[in-house]
């Protein structure tokens, strides 16, 4: 998966930093420099249905449970953009109803905004139903595909902007306003389609690999359990 992510990053840089794919296009001046004509900048928040975060159940007098609805924390998200399900906590349905504002849906992007900043993952059907705490932002797109935005994050488009706008308190954190204010360079529709034809199969392959690694890990755990119980 490192190779797949590296390939996505290379394609992203070629398109959005070097403009190799549109080298012959006419360029116009924007507030962030020269960009191809018909491309435009939009704020991340304007491309999303919602950008929100969660709450720790104990602040509502509720507690974690041994099983139930997945509760994602910052440490549940790996550096390679997969989920570490062993690090999920769990809540019951009553607590999830109290925290319905921060329910996570399939194809949301989760992004750490406190503690270790900037880890992110794209949610698939194996993760939901799920909820999260205040250290994790939920980014739900509407005017850009989740896979396309995910590729921007893999391409590290957000890194410098978020680094400059990190709030230093007891621990470093990013506000939801900062998350929403990230300028996103959007190609015209035809260019978007061409770009996604290149990166979407790679993202799909990454997600397939994540699922396969998880399946093999579960199989290994089952075998180890059987071995230990047969002694």
Regions found by a protein language model. Give the residues of each.
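Non-catalytic DNA-recognition/assembly elements of restriction-modification systems
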Residues: 1-55, 181, 185, 189-231
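Generic alpha-helical structural context detector
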Residues: 9, 13, 17, 46-49, ...
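Sequence-specific dsDNA recognition surfaces
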Residues: 27-28, 45-62, 75-106, 126, ...
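A generic secondary-structure signal marking the coil-to-beta-strand transition
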Residues: 40, 67-70, 87, 135
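A glycine-rich phosphate-binding loop feature that marks nucleotide/adenosyl-phosphate handling sites
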Residues: 64-65, 218
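A short beta-sheet element
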Residues: 73-74, 93-158, 165-171, 175-179
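C-terminal structured domain segments across diverse proteins
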Residues: 156, 161, 202-205
């Amino acid at each position: 998966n490192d190779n797949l992510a590296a390939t996505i990053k290379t394609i992203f840089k070629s398109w959005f930093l070097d403009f190799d794919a549109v080298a012959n296009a006419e360029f116009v001046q924007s507030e962030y420099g020269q960009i191809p004509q018909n491309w435009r900048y939009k704020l991340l928040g304007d491309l999303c249905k919602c950008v929100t975060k969660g709450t720790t159940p104990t602040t509502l007098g509720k507690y974690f449970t041994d099983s139930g609805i997945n509760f994602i924390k910052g440490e549940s998200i790996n550096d390679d953009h997969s989920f570490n399900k062993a690090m999920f906590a769990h809540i019951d349905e009553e607590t999830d109803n109290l925290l319905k504002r921060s329910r996570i849906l399939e194809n949301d992007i989760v992004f750490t905004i406190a503690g270790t900043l900037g880890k992110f993952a794209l949610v698939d059907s194996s993760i939901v139903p799920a909820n999260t705490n205040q250290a994790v932002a939920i980014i739900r797109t509407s005017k850009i595909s989740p896979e396309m935005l995910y590729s921007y994050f893999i391409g590290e488009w957000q890194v410098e902007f978020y680094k400059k706008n990190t709030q230093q308190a007891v621990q470093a954190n990013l506000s939801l306003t900062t998350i929403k204010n990230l300028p996103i360079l959007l190609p015209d529709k035809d260019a978007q389609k061409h770009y996604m034809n290149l990166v979407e199969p790679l993202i799909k392959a990454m997600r397939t690999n994540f699922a396969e690694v998880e399946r093999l890990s579960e199989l290994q755990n089952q075998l180890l359990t059987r071995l230990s119980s047969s002694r």
